[in-house]
Amino acid sequence: MPTEWLVGTALAAFAAALAISAVLTPAVRKLALRIGAVDVPNRRKVHTTIMPRLGGLAVYVAFVSVVLPLFLWVYRIAPGTEEGNLFAALLTGGTLIALLGALDDRFDLPAGLKFVVQLAVACLVVFGFDVRIEFVNIPFGSAMQPVGEWLGVPLTIFWIVGVTNAINLIDGLDGLAAGVSGISLATILVMAALMGNETMVLMAAVLIGAVAGFLIFNFHPARIFMGDSGALFLGFTLAMLSLHEFKQITVVSFVTPLLIIGVPLSDTFFAIVRRVVNKRPIFAPDKGHLHHCLQQLGFSHRKTVLIIYGIAAFFGVCAVVQSLISKSGVGTWVTFIVICVIMFLLQIGAELIGLVHRTRRPVLDFLARLRMKLSAASRPK
């Protein structure tokens, strides 16, 4: 496909999805209020008035309305191919996940039921559409090895369910989940363009447009929440797109999708650690997420969201740079160093803002003791 055609098609698809989403969102808002799909404030939430949710319905409809004609009649994706399977899995699984989220927005479904349905959808994707991780690389080597179903299947299911829920966990401030998802999708689009993956470029462009149209009404002060219908749908599509882009996993390449979705995944990881440390159920909600900690430090609602946007953009840039250097001979070693540095910075940041515990700061305490010892050793005797 000529570059000019791809760019023009991607821009047109983006604009169409944005327009449809922007037009549908006010209508969805009225529908949510009419049927009682609302979010009632409580001590854990930052909003103080009843807010309509179900906003993800506008994102879903905008995405499907553009991507269906685009890939069936314009791009003419072939059924039965790898791209065709991805397309079918994305639409089928995405529809089921969006329906699950919409029902939860209205009826507040039990967490266990939602998890079981997500697991079933992930299994449908893996076994019904043959979308799975297939190869792995020996660490610091170059030989690709097939992983077999015993590893590829559970790893794929874990990835889909994990990322689907990770986006939902950060949906705590106006525009946060939508904006972070948009940044992650933009990263996928850039990397797909660099790799020459036209299908991924177009899919990402459509979804970015759908998210952007909704974000007009969701950024602070929000007039509607995306709800689980949006958070779960965006999480599922991000999992699918990143999984397709990096199906052949190496020590280098598997870091890339982790970086692309770095903010929700790291926040989810620290949430699990925090609840284990504090001896609370893993699925129990709390006010210890990244956005809560930043607000407790004195940042306003809008500034907190923009700071997290910046962190998400940083992860995105790291993903692109890491992907580019991985093609060189030193890529594995550079990636290993990058992983260590990012993990160290994440731990320092988590301890500084109390993301895990208010008083337990092992790395900061170690650095303080080390500084004291070095200072004492440098004094003249």
Residue spans of the language-model regions?
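"…together with the soluble PPM/PP2C metallo-phosphatase catalytic core" -> "…together
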Residues: 2-268
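Membrane-interface capping segments at transmembrane-helix boundaries
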Residues: 27-30, 346-363
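Cytosolic, membrane-interface loops and tails of multi-pass inner-membrane proteins
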Residues: 27-52, 270-302, 370, 374
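N-terminal hydrophobic signal/anchor transmembrane helix of membrane proteins
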Residues: 244-250, 336-354
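Hydrophobic transmembrane alpha-helical segments of multi-pass transport and channel proteins
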Residues: 261-269, 317, 344-348
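Alpha-helical transmembrane segments of integral membrane proteins
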Residues: 296-314, 320-323
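Extracellular/periplasmic helix-loop-helix junctions in multi-pass membrane proteins
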Residues: 319-337
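Short, highly charged, low-complexity non-transmembrane loops/tails of multi-pass membrane proteins
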Residues: 356-378
